[in-house]
């Protein structure tokens, strides 16, 4: 594995369970944060203003709204989202190749219209909360999760997306198939002994990076820690080894 000169670039802080004031306080505690993830909860409660605030503070944004609808609706959503200045925007690969291709074109068009660099669209494969048992029982899908993730990542790549979101358990075999320019964004990162909460397919930070993850999404392990700054530094130290 290559030496990582700036490990903070590899960590995306998930701002889940936080309001705008919480976010401001966290950024004061950890000014080294480079990337943040704004999900449904924060975006719905605070609106686009929170994105403007984060941009003003010089943060890079992963807008994780996981768009999943008919192709025209997904494309229009990505057109609008691309004008927020977010560097990454997520959408479900299960929306299908037509939706993904239209979304990619719309995001490029939307960003260009306001003189912004187009964002990378990231295809959601299988959420880290799914287990093999629930995958089969709830969705009646007989494929293994690995097989399904591999197929959905291929759809993302063939549609022109900039990468995909997958659990640490799938990173290694995906990285063998895709170059480093194809982002593999990995949630489900936990520190040793921490609670996995509602995620099932998890790993530690060092292993995920070694297996080929581009960036790690880390939330509660840092944001709910008694010493968030220490935990952030601890994760940076782990992935720089």
UniProtKB/Swiss-Prot annotation:
Keyword entries, A-Z: Decarboxylase, Lyase, Pyrimidine biosynthesis
Pathway(s) the chain acts in: Pyrimidine metabolism; UMP biosynthesis via de novo pathway; UMP from orotate: step 2/2
Q: What is its EC number?
A: 4.1.1.23
The keyword Zinc belongs to this UniProt entry's keyword annotation: no
First-level EC class: lyase
Pfam families referenced in this protein's UniProt entry, alphabetically: OMPdecase (PF00215)
Q: Which residues form the active site?
A: 66 (proton donor)
The annotated subunit structure for this chain is: Homodimer.
Which family, according to the similarity comment? Belongs to the OMP decarboxylase family. Type 1 subfamily.
Protein's name in the database: Orotidine 5'-phosphate decarboxylase
Species this chain originates from: Prochlorococcus marinus (strain NATL1A)
Q: Which gene encodes it?
A: pyrF
